[in-house]
A protein has these predicted regions:
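N-terminal charged segments
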Residues: 1-84
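Short amphipathic alpha-helix that is part of the acyltransferase structural core
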Residues: 2-19, 102-133, 242-252
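Conserved hydrophobic beta-strand within the GNAT/NAT acetyltransferase core sheet
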Residues: 170, 203-207
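Conserved active-site alpha-helix within GNAT-family acetyltransferase domains
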Residues: 83-88, 186, 209-227
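A conserved beta-strand-loop-helix scaffold within acyl/acetyltransferase catalytic domains
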Residues: 134-144, 148-176
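A short, internal acetyl-CoA/4′-phosphopantetheine-binding micro-motif in the GNAT/acyltransferase core
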Residues: 52-58, 173-180, 208
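Conserved catalytic-core motifs of GNAT/GCN5-like acyltransferases
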Residues: 89-101, 206, 224-238
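Conserved acetyl-CoA-binding loop-helix of GNAT-fold acetyltransferases
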Residues: 61-66, 181-198, 215-220
Length: 252
């Protein structure tokens, strides 16, 4: 068993940190091989992850690059942004929390099995049943995913998603409703964290701000609330409609 211990003041709240823009840091770092990028905007392939990120959400040039990347009239999520520029439509907004492993005991789970592409149909079925967050046909390529089976059926899983330099996000933590209350999710989180720490990274994770049950669980096993996060789902300006409409004529 190993323990991830960070000092109480593990970051300076007045200075930028790689986790402040984790998706961008991952797409321009360890996950650069997945990145579809135009200038200051990047995203994962649509069958890998829904994450879209901007180098600086306050920079209008980054939004122009995003429009070029995803195309006109396209709905896309944007991490770390709250209000899009004029001409963009906000479809939905959401708040989350980010937690960092400051005192997490990590250890392998002997009953856990490594999940791969051949397990994706079962993984997608479990995700649909439990709704822990986005998981797509190629999400399994982002890192290590572990699962626990009961009589051959996948009943719990957890794995790795974002990988900003020095950090790895634990994601897709879920247990089938018929098997909850047995500590399966906790064992898988510890096991995934053990692999993360073996390569020298620090585990972190995200959850919805309103998911107080999950937040309390993660805090109880050694995660500390790091920051609140914002995201928006936006529709890019449809320049095609503007071009079709043409200039307005106002004859007196």
């Amino acid at each position: 068993m190993s323990t991830s211990v960070l000092p109480v003041a593990w970051r300076n709240p007045d200075a930028p940190h790689v986790l402040d823009n984790a998706a961008w840091a991952a797409l321009t770092g360890p996950h650069a091989r997945f990145a579809e990028r135009v200038g200051h905007a990047a995203r994962y392939p649509l069958d890998v992850s829904p994450f879209t990120a901007l180098a600086d959400p306050s920079d209008p040039r980054a939004w122009d690059d995003l429009a070029a990347l995803v195309g006109p009239g396209t709905v896309t999520p944007v991490s770390g942004a709250t209000v899009p520029p004029a001409g963009w439509e906000t479809v939905r907004s959401g708040q989350g929390v980010q937690l960092v492993a400051t005192a997490l005991h990590s250890e392998p789970a002997p009953e856990a099995v490594r999940l791969g592409p051949g397990d994706v149909p079962e993984m997608l079925e479990l995700i649909a049943e439990t709704e822990p967050g986005p998981f797509l046909p190629r999400t399994v390529e982002l890192g290590t995913y572990l699962g626990i089976r009961h009589r051959g059926r996948l009943i719990a899983m957890a794995g790795e998603r974002l990988r900003p330099p020095g950090w790895t996000e634990i994601s897709a933590v879920c247990t089938h409703p018929d098997h909850r209350g047995r500590g399966l999710a906790t064992r898988l989180v510890r096991a995934v964290a053990a692999g993360i720490r073996e390569r020298g990274d620090i585990p972190f994770l995200h959850t919805a701000a309103g998911n107080t049950t999950a937040i309390r669980l993660y805090e109880s096993i050694g995660f500390t609330l790091s920051r609140r996060t914002e995201s928006v789902r936006v529709r890019t300006p449809d320049r095609r409609q503007e071009q079709t409409a043409g200039p307005c004529r106002c004859d007196a």
